[in-house]
A protein has these predicted regions:
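Class I S-adenosyl-L-methionine-dependent methyltransferase catalytic core
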Residues: 1-132
Length: 132
């Protein structure tokens, strides 16, 4: 009985994700990451990398270019997906300045309005429902 008991308190993202995989995903692995970027999350938190890696602007040769709202996958083809989307909305002029400000925004992109950001989330979730 104790082997199925997992603490619900943790400050370690890797521990949290690995526990979710253990409890809820029979294969204990993430099949797809549609917003992979450089995969630093997997390396930093010791989470097994997904077989299917997509990104709108791939940084690595093994990552396939794809918009997460239109994945090149069959319906019902995977069991688990990791989604780490853009989370910022701004119209600030600092995005166009050539300086060290807004590093996150410049690297990952932003949406001009919260409404557009939330629409991106909604469209992405509809697509994930299709492939899961």
């Amino acid at each position: 009985m104790m082997k199925n008991l997992i603490s619900s308190i943790s400050y370690d993202q890797g521990e949290i994700i690995n526990n979710i995989l253990r409890l809820h995903v029979p294969s204990h692995k993430i099949d797809c990451d549609p917003t992979y970027s450089k995969g630093n999350f997997y390396k930093k938190y010791n989470v097994p990398e997904p077989q299917l890696k997509f990104d709108i602007s791939p940084c690595l040769p093994e990552v396939v270019q794809a918009d997460c709202r239109h994945l090149p996958m069959e319906n019902d083809s995977i069991d688990c997906l990791m989604f780490d989307p853009p989370f910022l909305a701004t119209k600030g002029p600092s995005l166009s300045k050539d300086d060290d400000n807004n590093k996150i925004n410049k690297r990952f992109g932003v949406y001009p309005t919260e409404k557009e950001l939330f629409q991106f989330y909604t469209d992405s979730l509809v697509e994930f429902h299709r492939v899961l």
